[in-house]
Amino acid sequence: RHKSVIDDLQRTLTEQAGLLDAINRSMAVIEFDLDGMVLRANDNFLKTMGYSAEQAIGQAHRRFCTAEFGRSAQYTDLWSRLKNGQFQSGTFERVDGKGQPIWLEASYNPIKDASGRVVKVVKYAMDVTAKMQQESEANAKLQAIDRAMAVIEFNLDGSILTANQNFLTRMGYTLAELKGKHHR
């Protein structure tokens, strides 16, 4: 009977080790203590951020943030929530080892001990800088088109959804006068 329990536990541990290994292979992972000091960072994190282990371990989380964010109320709130066991996720602007902006799609995960007390925070992240740059370039192109051309948008039934300022100025209307009206 005990051998069966031990075998089940061994299988569970092996499976969990495999899952952790998969995460470490595919994601940037960093661990912080509750003061925001780096405890450990995997190779993916170090490579993504441009740091060596010696440069990262023992450093404050703020080191990876923009100076503005590191001094903000949002930063204080982030760590307050984490210390209270609240998971946080999103797209975060950070700064790499060369001082360049980098965008991370990340989750901050409070880790609790057996008594339910938060003891550290583990961050799982993926570099989405290229995606953010593409979105920024696409938005810049759309804004340039909006400034250069008269644009009006219609619903499938022919009613006006919106029009840009160039269209409104050239046609002598306000958006309120056109919105919802049929194009005829």
Predicted feature residues:
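PAS-family sensory domains
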Residues: 2-5, 83, 93-99, 112-113, 117-127
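Sensory-domain boundary/capping and coupling elements
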Residues: 4-14, 132-146
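Conserved hydrophobic beta-strand signature of PAS-family and PAS-like sensory domains
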Residues: 29, 36-39, 151, 158-161
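N-terminal capping loop/helix in small sensory signaling domains highlighted by a polar->aromatic N-x2-3-F motif
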Residues: 33, 42-45, 164-167
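PAS/PAS-like sensory domain cap-loop motif
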Residues: 45-56, 167-179
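PAS-family sensory/regulatory domains
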Residues: 55-69, 177-184
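Sensory-domain boundary capping and coupling elements
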Residues: 106-108, 125
